[in-house]
UniProtKB/Swiss-Prot annotation:
Transmembrane segments: none annotated. This is GTP cyclohydrolase-2. The active site is at D125 (proton acceptor), R127 (nucleophile). Its cofactor is Zn(2+). It catalyses: GTP + 4 H2O = 2,5-diamino-6-hydroxy-4-(5-phosphoribosylamino)-pyrimidine + formate + 2 phosphate + 3 H(+). One of its GO terms (biological process) is riboflavin biosynthetic process. Pathway: Cofactor biosynthesis; riboflavin biosynthesis; 5-amino-6-(D-ribitylamino)uracil from GTP: step 1/4.
């Protein structure tokens, strides 16, 4: 993992320092948005966010990605300190944009999000988070409060010796358009979600 560029990034959430990283031996680039002092600090509020063009940019209701991104940046801004890693190459759980749209078409025919990927001969989830752990190491983040519903992220950070002190829930609205998607992730991937009545 190589740090290739850094610059100030003013946003509607506040001002971040942006760090662009390139994965060794590949074309993948990831972006870290950092607010405040995170080096050698305990329990840094952190989000590992998988790229999702349809959700993050266009506000698609098929998933909860865009709302999780927005909420994560709001939490970091409110605290005045934190890290958001925007992980490129994770589109459609790592299958790419075109294949994600093909999977959407299968979902419209009744397949769930996992079945659709498998029907296309693709993995149910091709993402890796080792790159995220490497970036956190470069940023000298020693422990995190992780904003995530995905247990795979917790496991990867633990394997790399980055303690997760707390899981910060990202409770975004379940909509008619994404309810089946969210329930499938909960049932098939063990994602953490709240019942709205809890």
């Amino acid at each position: 993992m190589t740090l290739v560029a850094t610059a100030t990034l003013p946003t509607r959430y506040g001002t971040f320092t942006s760090y662009a990283f390139r994965v060794a031996g590949g074309d993948a680039e990831h972006l870290a948005l950092v607010m405040g002092d995170v080096a050698e600090q305990p329990s840094v509020l952190t989000r590992l966010h998988s790229e999702c063009l349809t959700g993050d940019v266009f506000g698609s209701y098929r998933c909860d990605c865009g709302e999780q991104l927005d909420l994560s940046l709001r939490y970091i801004a409110a605290e005045g300190r934190g890290v958001l890693l925007y992980l490129r190459g994770h589109e459609g759980r790592g299958i790419g944009l075109s294949n994600k749209i093909r999977a959407y078409a299968l979902q419209e025919q009744g397949r769930d999000t996992v079945e659709a990927n498998l029907d296309l001969g693709l993995p149910d989830d091709a993402r890796e988070y080792d790159s995220a752990a490497a970036i956190l190491r470069i940023l000298k983040v020693t422990s995190v409060r992780l904003m995530s519903n995905n247990p795979k992220k917790f496991d990867t950070l633990a394997r790399h010796g980055i303690p997760v002190c707390e899981r910060v829930a990202l409770a975004v609205p379940v909509r008619e358009e994404n309810e089946r998607y969210i329930r499938t992730k909960q049932l098939k991937f063990g994602h953490y979600y709240f019942d709205e009545n809890e």
